[in-house]
């Protein structure tokens, strides 16, 4: 027996010893571990631990997933409306959530309506900015002080360079209601000497714009006598528009105010002498001179003609053949 155990086939001699270890699987494994300690690390336990570790991980992840689902269902139950006969199981809660979302999307605005509302808001903001810019520009042109800075010491002067670089349209039909000369006159007094500092080209352009837009404003006394550039001639100084149009542009029967009728009632009987009714009345030179001096430079407008002439010289139905009587 000793010679057989010393043979180089130890597996055959180990088989009965393995079978003799308690006769069970656990005993066989323990015996195998004891026999394999000297040869190296055991490989059988590592094979047995692999599937068990993966199984434990799957169980843990499944438990976490179920916890999340139950928590979400509890939140949905609290958010959904309460009514009689509502089911509280998980499937019913999910179905009610889907139906509620469909109803909300049908009643609420869609994505296209959201885009339309956003674009309309942007247009409204841009319109408000445009109105604000127009208001500020009109205040600057009219010389109104800014509300934030309080009352300014003087009117604000517009930038002539910016005005020349971007002038308004030269078409009178598309022109703004306020002409350029009035804007310039309200911002500062017109001084011909200021054109020399601007240059001949800019001065010519500015004068051309003023002529198109209604003529130059009345010139004030220049601060310094600066000679006008050679070769240039000032346009005719246009005086402020008369309150009465010229006599050639008046109607045949001019409309007179109450004050003019009062003057006529006072001057008419005194200006006429004891002439017959059919003959023209003679004019008193003293009364004519007083009327002319009272009116000043309005002689060209025809006002003195109305105040000094008698009724016999009026054209139309107020002529010599007029007879006062009740209307027919």
UniProtKB/Swiss-Prot annotation:
Instruction: Please give the SMART domains that the UniProt record associates with this protein.
Output: HLH
SUPFAM superfamilies in the record: HLH, helix-loop-helix DNA-binding domain
Please name the disease the record associates with this protein. Spermatogenic failure 32: An autosomal dominant infertility disorder caused by spermatogenesis defects that result in non-obstructive azoospermia. Ovarian dysgenesis 5: A disorder characterized by lack of spontaneous pubertal development, primary amenorrhea, uterine hypoplasia, and hypergonadotropic hypogonadism as a result of streak gonads. ODG5 is an autosomal recessive condition.
Question: Which residue stretches belong to region Disordered?
Answer: 290-328
GO CC terms on record?
chromatin; cytoplasm; nucleus
Fill in the subunit field for this protein. Answer: Forms both hetero- and homodimers with SOHLH2.
Work out whether the entry's keyword set contains Nucleus.
yes
Record carries keyword Plastid: no
- The bHLH domain covers 53-104
Q: Which biological process, per GO, is one annotated for this protein? A: cell differentiation
Q: State the compartments where it is located.
A: Cytoplasm; Nucleus
Q: Which domain of life is it from?
A: Eukaryota
Q: Which InterPro entries match?
A: bHLH_dom, HLH_DNA-bd_sf, TCFL5/SOLH1/2
Describe the task this protein carries out.
Answer: Transcription regulator of both male and female germline differentiation. Suppresses genes involved in spermatogonial stem cells maintenance, and induces genes important for spermatogonial differentiation. Coordinates oocyte differentiation without affecting meiosis I.
Q: What organism is listed for this UniProt entry? A: Homo sapiens
What name does the UniProt record give this protein?
Spermatogenesis- and oogenesis-specific basic helix-loop-helix-containing protein 1
| Biased composition range(s): Low complexity | 310-321
One matching Pfam family: HLH
Which GO molecular function annotations are given, in alphabetical order?
DNA-binding transcription factor activity, RNA polymerase II-specific; protein heterodimerization activity; protein homodimerization activity; transcription cis-regulatory region binding
CDD domains registered for this protein in UniProt: bHLH_SOHLH1_2
What is the first-listed, main subcellular location in coarse terms? cytoplasm
Going by the UniProt record, its keywords in alphabetical order are: Cytoplasm, Developmental protein, Differentiation, Disease variant, DNA-binding, Nucleus, Spermatogenesis, Transcription, Transcription regulation
